[in-house]
Curated annotation (Swiss-Prot):
Gene3D superfamilies listed in its UniProt record: 3.30.160.810, Translation factors (2.40.30.10)
Subunit composition and interactions: Part of the 50S ribosomal subunit. Forms a cluster with proteins L14 and L19.
Position of the signal peptide: none
Membership in a protein family: Belongs to the universal ribosomal protein uL3 family.
UniProt source species: Levilactobacillus brevis (strain ATCC 367 / BCRC 12310 / CIP 105137 / JCM 1170 / LMG 11437 / NCIMB 947 / NCTC 947)
GO MF annotation terms: rRNA binding; structural constituent of ribosome
Phylogenetic classification of the source organism: Bacteria, Bacillati, Bacillota, Bacilli, Lactobacillales
Protein name in UniProt: Large ribosomal subunit protein uL3
Keywords: Ribonucleoprotein, Ribosomal protein, RNA-binding, rRNA-binding
Length: 216
C-alpha cells in the first residue's frame, strides 16, 4: 500500500452539515503547497522516500547547508522538513508541489502532532487517579500512594507526578470531510492533537478499518 502525505498547520475546529442535515465536528488544517526537496531511492539512500518542505523561512535564519539543499529544488529555505516512506516515487520529482488535492473526501488518514503542554502536574490531573478520603480524620488526599512491596527502587513507567503533555501523538483513522483546493484547507472529522497554529502531519492510514460485512 502506497502512502500519501502532506504537512499543514492546525487552524482550529468548526462544524459542517451534510446534505441530510447531520452535524459533523471538523478540524481545519491549512496545508499550503509543500515542496518536494529530495527523492530518496533504494540505490542511493538505502530506502525509498520523499522529503517535503513546508512554510518558508528567512534566509538570514538558515545556514549554508540548508540553503544549498533547497537550492536543488529552486525554492526558499523551509521551516519544517519531513520524510514520507512507502510512496510511489514515480509520482514525485524534485521541486514538485504537493497540494491538498492529494487527498479526497472520504479518505482515511492518520494525523500526527505535538499535544499541548500542561507543565508539572500531579497524579489526579495527569493520570486520572482517584482522591483519598477528604474527611478530617484522613491524612491522605491527593498523594500518589504506595508504590508497592517492591525492592528499594522505582520501576520505570510507574505513574508518578511529572510533566504532562507536550508529546508527539498520532490519532489514527480519521476521515477527510473535504479538501478545499482554492483555500489550501483540509477538513478532518474530529479533533487532532496540538494547539492552534501548530504543525500537523497528515498521511494515509497505516491500519485502515476493515469494511463492514454489509459494505462488502
Amino acid at each position: 500500500m502506497t502512502t500519501k502525505g502532506i504537512l499543514g498547520k492546525k487552524v482550529g475546529m468548526t462544524q459542517v452539515f451534510t446534505d441530510a442535515g447531520e452535524l459533523i465536528p471538523v478540524t481545519v488544517v491549512e496545508a499550503t503547497p509543500n515542496v518536494v526537496l529530495q527523492v530518496k531511492t533504494m540505490e542511493n539512500d538505502g530506502y525509498n522516500a520523499i522529503q517535503l518542505g513546508y512554510q518558508d523561512k528567512r534566509e538570514v535564519l538558515s545556514n549554508k547547508p540548508e540553503q544549498g539543499h533547497v537550492a536543488k529544488a529552486n525554492t526558499t529555505p523551509k521551516r519544517f522538513i519531513r520524510e514520507f516512506t512507502d510512496v510511489e516515487l514515480g509520482d514525485y520529482k524534485v521541486a514538485d508541489e504537493v497540494k491538498v488535492d492529494t487527498f479526497q473526501a472520504g479518505d482515511i488518514v492518520d494525523v500526527t502532532g505535538v499535544t499541548k503542554g500542561h507543565g508539572y502536574q500531579g497524579n489526579i490531573h495527569k493520570d486520572g487517579q482517584s482522591r483519598g478520603p477528604m474527611a478530617h480524620g484522613s491524612r491522605y488526599h491527593r498523594r500518589p500512594g504506595s508504590l508497592g512491596a517492591i525492592i528499594n527502587r522505582v520501576f520505570p513507567g510507574m505513574k508518578l507526578p511529572g510533566r504532562m503533555g507536550n508529546k508527539q501523538v498520532t490519532i489514527q483513522n480519521l476521515v477527510i470531510v473535504k479538501a478545499d483546493v482554492e483555500n489550501n484547507v483540509l477538513l478532518i472529522k474530529g479533533n487532532v492533537p496540538g494547539a492552534n497554529k501548530s504543525l500537523v502531519t497528515v498521511k494515509s492510514a497505516v491500519r485502515p478499518p476493515r469494511p463492514k460485512q454489509s459494505e462488502k
